[in-house]
Amino acid sequence: MPTVEETQQQCRLALTDPTLAAIASALERRGPGLDQCVTYVADVTERPETVQPLAAIKADLERDGLDLADAQFERYLLTAAALRSLARLDQVPVTDCVRALCCDLYAKLPQRRPRLDLTHHSFAELSKVATLRRFPAGQFDWEPSGLPRSWLLKIRPVGALCQTLHVIAMRMRRFGPAFFVHTGVSGKNYLLLQREAERSYYRMAHSMALQPRVIGLITSSWLHSPDTFAISPHLAWLNRIFRENGAVLATMGPADPGCGVLHRSPERKRAYEEGRLKPTLGLVIWPRDEMLAWARTRPDLEH
């Protein structure tokens, strides 16, 4: 994987490409300028309104006749934002392995990506990585977050709610910050592999050890729901590591069928159409001490 210095060189070189350099010239000529655009990128989340300032700028550039096909505008902004983040990457409390994964992803930002557009969820995900609000760990990423209090009302069964409240009160002592896990933004995760998942958690644990205030790992997805495993038992390993190492497992009510649970799975799609699958969200809460204790037993995941 490239070093920080090598990645900086690659990003700078990419930004001199004539098609991307034309965007820079247009931004400086018309305003608001690149610095303001990078500030907008740092504010992008999954909420549609957060990309509106960038969408307005892009529309202005296109009206002026600039060709922005193949997500040139998006790739330019992400690369420019990543270049600024590289200057402070060494100060971020994550392991060298995670820094290397950041560099690897940053170096690929200028490349064409399918479906990359301001309105596509991948732009929000990559914006977070490019501005150090989300971190790659291999098969999975994480971002600093916490446990929303509103989720407590959704937790089922009641025993899991009681266990969650006990863990928060006695073990975590607060609702955040925590590492919230997502499937990786790198685009290589159509096939989930147990060892790669464990390697991701191992990398997260070692970065968590560098951040004393982080209370643990949290994730919520159809991937962790027992209703998913009833139709796709080959995925049950996804929760095994948590169940065997001190995590709280629960469900949180219905999942949107469009969340991905039916994607690339004829079995789950058929079960849904026949009424045998009612998608639900699984919830995982893995306290810090238990996660770090598990990581200490798995030095085999270092490489």
Give the positions of each predicted feature.
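Short acidic, S/G/P-rich loop/turn micro-motifs used as interaction or catalytic elements
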Residues: 185-194, 223-227
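Acidic/histidine-rich, metal-coordinating catalytic segments
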Residues: 215-225
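Non-catalytic substrate-recognition and accessory regions of acyl/acetyltransferase enzymes
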Residues: 2-189, 209-216, 230-303
